[in-house]
UniProtKB/Swiss-Prot annotation:
Region annotation Disordered: where it falls in the sequence: 1-36
UniProt protein name: UDP-galactose translocator 1
Membrane topology, as annotated: Multi-pass membrane protein
Localization per record: Membrane; Cytoplasmic granule membrane
Family indicated by similarity: Belongs to the nucleotide-sugar transporter family. SLC35A subfamily.
Species this protein is from: Caenorhabditis elegans
Keyword Membrane in annotation: yes
InterPro entries: Nuc_sug_transpt
One GO term describing the cellular component: Golgi membrane
Name of the gene this protein is made from: ugtp-1
Biased composition range(s): Basic and acidic residues: 9-30
Top-level taxon of the source organism: Eukaryota
Membrane-spanning residues: 40-60, 177-197, 211-231, 282-302, 309-329, 330-350
Length: 355
C-alpha cells in the first residue's frame, strides 16, 4: 500500500478509534489503585501511541519532503489547528463524562475552568512548552530523515530523568544510569551513520541540514522532558480538578501560544492564506498531532513516562522499516542498525527497574 493513498475521509473514523473509550478510563479509575490500570488498558495505550507516533513522523516527513517549497504549508498554522482540535475533543469528552447533562457540565466547567484562573495559569507552563516542542518538531523532521529523528529524540529520556530529579526528587539506580549512557552511545552511532551515508553516496542530493535538525531535536528533548514531568506532577497532585478539565486548561493556553507563534509567520499567512498548501495528508498531520497530545496526558495520568518510552522504542523500529519502503533515498547502514539496537536496549533497561 502506498503512502499516497491515505485519505482524510478515513481520519475522523480513525480518530474515534484512537481516543480511549470512557469505560476503559473508568476501569482504570475503579481499579484498586488508579496508578495500576489493567494490563489490557496498558497494552491499548502503548499500542495506540506507537501507531500515532509512527504515523505522525512518517506523514509530516512526507509532507515536508515531497512538496515544492513555494507550495509549502505553514507549520505554525498546523500546530494551531491541532491545539484547537485538542480543546474541542476535551470539551466533548468531558460533556460525555457528565452523561450529556448540560447543567452538570456547565456547573463543572464554571467551577473548575472559568472561575479558576490560578489553576489555568499553572497549566500554561507545560502548554507553552508543548507548543514550542511541536514547532521544533517540524524543524527537526524537515532537516533529518525520519529514522534519525526518531532515534535522536530518545535523548528526552535524559532530560526527563534530569527534571524528575530536579522537580520530583527522584533518584535513579545504577542500572538506569547505565541505560541513559547506552542511549547516548546509540545516538552517537546513528550520527556516525550520517557521515557514512554521505561518504558512501556522494551523488545523493538533499536539502536536509543536519546541524539545524539536530539542534532542533536537542531543544525538543529539553522542552519535552520539562513539560512531561511538570504535567505529570500536575495530574497526580491529588487535586480535585477533573482530568478533562486539566486538559481544557492546558490546551486553552496551547491555543494562545500557538496563535502567538503564528504571528512569526504572519506575513506569509496573510499573503497566501491560513490554509495555503493544506492537503488531505496535512489534515492527517493535524489529527495525529491533536490525538497524540491527548494520549500524552492519558499516559501521564494513568501510566508514567516509562511507558511512553516503550512506545517510542517500538516506534523507532517501525519508522526505520517503513521509511525504507516510502522514501527510496533512505540509507540504512550498520552504524544506524547498531545505534537503533543500543537505543532500544537502553529504553528496555531503563524500564526494567521496579520502583
Amino acid at each position: 500500500m502506498k503512502f499516497q493513498n491515505v485519505h482524510i475521509s478515513h481520519q475522523d473514523e480513525d480518530k474515534e478509534k484512537l481516543l480511549p473509550n470512557d469505560k476503559d478510563v473508568e476501569k482504570a479509575d475503579e481499579s484498586p489503585s488508579s496508578s495500576r490500570p489493567s494490563f489490557v488498558f496498558k497494552c491499548y495505550v502503548i499500542a495506540s501511541m506507537t501507531f500515532i507516533w509512527t504515523a505522525y513522523t512518517l506523514t509530516i516527513k512526507y509532507t515536508r519532503s515531497t512538496v515544492n517549497p513555494d507550495m509549502m504549508y505553514s507549520s505554525t498554522s498546523v500546530v494551531l489547528c491541532a491545539e484547537i482540535l485538542k480543546l474541542v475533543i476535551t470539551f466533548a469528552m468531558f460533556y460525555k463524562e457528565c452523561n450529556f447533562d448540560s447543567r452538570q457540565f456547565s456547573e463543572q466547567v464554571s467551577k473548575y475552568y472559568i472561575n479558576a484562573p490560578r489553576e489555568l495559569a499553572k497549566m500554561s507552563v507545560p502548554s507553552f512548552a508543548y507548543a514550542l516542542q511541536n514547532n521544533l518538531d517540524f524543524v527537526g523532521l524537515s532537516n533529518l530523515d525520519a529514522g534519525l529523528y526518531q532515534v535522536t529524540t530518545q535523548l528526552k529520556v535524559v532530560s526527563t530523568a534530569f527534571f524528575m530529579m530536579l522537580f520530583l526528587g527522584r533518584k535513579f539506580s545504577t542500572r538506569r544510569w547505565m541505560a541513559i549512557t547506552l542511549l547516548m552511545f546509540g545516538v552517537a552511532f546513528v550520527q556516525m551513520n550520517n557521515v557514512s551515508a554521505s561518504e558512501a553516496n556522494t551523488k545523493r542530493e538533499t536539502a536536509e541540514n543536519y546541524i539545524v535538525g539536530l539542534s532542533a531535536v536537542l531543544a525538543t528533548c529539553v522542552t519535552a522532558g520539562f513539560a512531561g514531568v511538570y504535567f505529570e506532577k500536575m495530574l497526580k497532585d491529588g487535586g480535585s480538578t477533573p482530568f478533562w478539565i486539566r486538559n481544557m486548561q492546558m490546551y486553552s493556553c496551547g491555543v494562545i501560544s500557538a496563535s502567538i507563534a503564528c504571528l512569526t509567520d504572519f506575513s506569509r499567512i496573510s499573503d497566501k492564506g491560513f490554509f495555503f498548501g493544506y492537503t488531505d495528508k496535512v489534515w492527517a498531520v493535524v489529527i495525529l498531532l491533536g490525538v497524540g497530545g491527548l494520549y500524552i496526558s492519558l499516559v501521564m495520568r494513568y501510566l508514567d513516562n516509562l511507558y511512553k518510552s516503550m512506545a517510542s522504542a517500538v516506534s523507532i523500529i517501525l519508522v526505520v522499516v517503513l521509511s525504507m519502503l516510502i522514501f527510496p533515498d533512505i540509507f540504512i547502514g550498520m552504524y544506524f542498525v547498531l545505534g537503533t539496537i543500543c537505543v532500544v536496549l537502553a529504553v528496555l533497561l531503563y524500564n526494567s527497574v521496579n520502583e
